[in-house]
Amino acid sequence: MKFKSTKRFGPITTGHRQWRDRGHCSFIHGYGRYVRLTFEASELDERGWVMDFGDLKDVKGWIEDEWDHRTLIADDDPLIPQLKELEEMGGIDLNILPEGYYPGIEESCRYLYDMINPMIKEKTNNRVEITRVEIWETEKNQAEYVR
């Protein structure tokens, strides 16, 4: 039997640009993103919990450091030189994602999983892992990454 619990963070005001899009998503735009992480364990801890939500301050801080009022772009965005110039002038707080990740919510789910799941496994001695990451950019638009 598996036990699951979820934790939701947000809204986290985040901008991004999807330069490969042929439409308006190629422009810098943003949303108040909500993130929901699903934790899974075969055994509960000594308190009967899957995850101690009070022990997620570092996870919340990491997400906020990466996303809050920042603009996410892919590492192969052709406007990187101009965006870096704008950042130097104080007009943007740029976050160039690692190679292979893109700023849309689908890839953002995978990025969070890849970055945060090792943190969770370490803090729980491999007892807990993330099995689902969901992100909402609006009430109507949501994506998820499922392990």
Annotate each language-model stretch with its function:
Residues 1-147:
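Charge-rich, low-complexity N-terminal segments
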